Curated annotation (Swiss-Prot):
GO BP, one annotated term: lipid glycosylation
Reactions that this protein is recorded to catalyse: di-trans,octa-cis-undecaprenyl diphospho-N-acetyl-alpha-D-muramoyl-L-alanyl-D-glutamyl-meso-2,6-diaminopimeloyl-D-alanyl-D-alanine + UDP-N-acetyl-alpha-D-glucosamine = di-trans,octa-cis-undecaprenyl diphospho-[N-acetyl-alpha-D-glucosaminyl-(1->4)]-N-acetyl-alpha-D-muramoyl-L-alanyl-D-glutamyl-meso-2,6-diaminopimeloyl-D-alanyl-D-alanine + UDP + H(+)
Pfam families registered for this protein in UniProt: Glyco_tran_28_C, Glyco_transf_28
Residues bound to UDP-N-acetyl-alpha-D-glucosamine: T11, G12, G13, N120, R161, S188, Q282
EC number: 2.4.1.227
Record organism: Prochlorococcus marinus (strain MIT 9303)
Protein name, per record: UDP-N-acetylglucosamine--N-acetylmuramyl-(pentapeptide) pyrophosphoryl-undecaprenol N-acetylglucosamine transferase
Membrane topology: Peripheral membrane protein
UniProt-annotated location(s): Cell inner membrane
Superkingdom as given in the UniProt entry: Bacteria
Amino acid sequence: MPRLLIAASGTGGHLFPALAVAESLPASWSVCWLGVPDRLETQLVPERYELTTVRAGGLQGRGLRKLVQLLQLLAATGRVRKLLRKQGIQTVFTTGGYIAAPAILAARWCGIPVVLHESNAIPGRVTRLLGRFCQVVAVGLSVAAKRIPGSKAVVTGTPVRSAFLSPQPLPHWVPCGDGPLLVVIGGSQGAVGLNRMVRGALPSLLEAGCRVVHLTGNNDPDVGELDHPNLVEQPFSHEMPGLLQHADLAISRAGAGSLSELAVCGTPTILVPFPQAADQHQEANAACAAALGAAVIVHQHAAEHRALGHALEQLMGARLRGNAAASNPLIPMKQGMMKLAVREADQLLVTLLKPLIGAGL
């Protein structure tokens, strides 16, 4: 029986693509999962796959802190090596992040092949440092391939959960009416700056008949500040495929996972890159979508609500005013998103894994 270790941890951007690949594997394969304690995977993974957790962190600190992190990495690598041998793992698949480092190093130690998936336009630290130890580095965006040394990079796109790839109903709790639907994705941790920016731009849209679903995340202190019958605020939704498939427009950060979900749904989007993202990778992700005409970029700054309000007026104003003769700028944006989408990304990654699974014997 082929035995695969999936190392994916932390955020949905790392976890959901890995789960999509796991769902697409042949039924005969056995999957073990490597994660970090107290992260999202402890909620999503155990009901489907055997989960092992190890402490892992980055190497961004200095002095004593960096030394502690290095010792932690060495300890984690030793634990993963024991896991690989105990479970008879033949291949490792990882989506990057902190957990990828001990997984790649332990696999290298044991002579086990690794497929690393990098979803962002600018490769992360682990990809840059440890990609050389992997048999294949799969990338979600073609521009990232140019930043991968050697000839290991293969463009596969970033996998999305299967529900995004088939028609889904509009959730029943979405505000009723004929107005266009705007979906705001604030982020799982609550992007407070983005949420405040959105609330500053919404009142005129709501009064004009626009329906708005605002997914605020868990840590937004201003929930309930704006009250309107056309507005629904929720921390998150398990019905994202239905929301995005039926949305006329979305507002989102520019994480690679979110961008892939928006792309397969063909959802025109205003992207607001997270200003503190490592290496400004969200700026680069957003630029890829904007270059195809799929998205408009609005930056978070002192006059953010005015910039966002202007973009919303440009994209939705004519429809809200009932001007049927005006051209709809959302149509070419939808076409651009469809060009960005790679609907078979999960299958492409499985195809890369199949010839390697025997190489780890």
